[in-house]
Amino acid sequence: MDIAHDLQSIGAQEQALVFPHFDPARAWALGNRMHALATSRGHAIAIDIATFGQPLFYAALAGATPDNADWVRRKRNVVAHFRRSSYAIGLRMQQAGATLADKHGLPVAEYASHGGSFPLTVAGAGVIGSITASGLPQRADHEFVVEALCAELGHDYAVLALARS
């Protein structure tokens, strides 16, 4: 894995995966798309879609644990704080040889800079929330969300996917 290349690719994902508008019905549709995709692959994950301060969709699939809900919350907090993907922030911390606690004073009990939470961005409004998955390895959590967003927004996932490790 090339961190610099991944960070560049994640930046492109964040620029491309923007909703023209977003409402609870769209959250429900996206959440159900993610649920169906995860179920078809046998993923034991938790899925969360929220605007800042308001949950819009949550599902814990068979095999997901209460720990996944906590990981969702902590990853979502990273997106809320930085307005960037939790995976991008984690890679930046890895590059710097630092942690969120060291560099930003953010407690590990509240923030997880691991892949899986992606900014929910609306054209003309900016980042308004997050789309999060937890239960797979962090890179796979990140890519699961990106793949679902590509399908929802009509983008070619093969173009936006991170390079295979």
From Swiss-Prot:
Source organism of this protein record: Burkholderia cenocepacia (strain ATCC BAA-245 / DSM 16553 / LMG 16656 / NCTC 13227 / J2315 / CF5610) (Burkholderia cepacia (strain J2315))
SUPFAM superfamilies named in the record: GlcG-like (SSF143744)
Top-level taxonomic group: Bacteria
Protein name per its UniProtKB record: UPF0303 protein BceJ2315_15790
Cross-referenced NCBIfam families: PRK02487.1-4 (NF002695), PRK02487.1-5 (NF002696)
Endpoints of the signal sequence: none
Family listed: Belongs to the UPF0303 family.
InterPro entries cross-referenced by the UniProt entry: PduO/GlcC-like (IPR005624), PduO/GlcC-like_sf (IPR038084), YBR137W-like (IPR010371)
Pfam families: HbpS-like (PF03928)
